[in-house]
Amino acid sequence: MARRETPEINAGSMADIAFLLLIFFLVTTTMNVDSGISKKLSEKPPPDYKPPIIKEKNIFEVNINRNNDLLVEGDIMGIKEIKEAAIKFIDNGGGLGKPGEDGTPGLPCDYCEGERSESSSDHPNKAIISVQSDRLTEYGTYLMVQDELLRAYSELRNRLSLIKYNIPFVELEESYKDDKQNEALKKKVEDIKISYPQIISDAEPTN
């Protein structure tokens, strides 16, 4: 009686199938990516650091409660209204800027186009935006508020860059990123950033 041989399994074909399954998994699987805002954290101050006295008019308060309602400078406000309110505050130019590092007195903002109200911010380099949320505030709402505030700075920087250098700041910054050795571009980017420094402070969340 003839012996019946057991058929062999084609290992090569199984490897091909496993590879195809892996490719299928990679193509059809989605990965959750956390959204957020890129921020440079402030350095820890020295033990003997004394915080400067800040006038109340130089602080723009944004409060987000647990129901995701916004209270901006004491008034109820919608998210889409924040940008214009922030621009009005930052660009007010109602007084003098910070003194220079060499002790020279601060100067008025000659490029500001605001109302120059004595009850609002003195200068863009003194204008602080304080954002305080509740521990139950939705993160999505917090991000939308931050985005509107960043858009306010972006609009002011673009405007000034167009006036001084005939190019929007976003394009100026991109040009510098492509040519880091260009000192002229570097000075222009720094000039606009110093003129409208992005000062957003996150206050401790309320309970």
Tell what function each PLM region has.
Residues 32-207:
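Long, low-hydrophobicity, acidic/polar, solvent-exposed interaction domains
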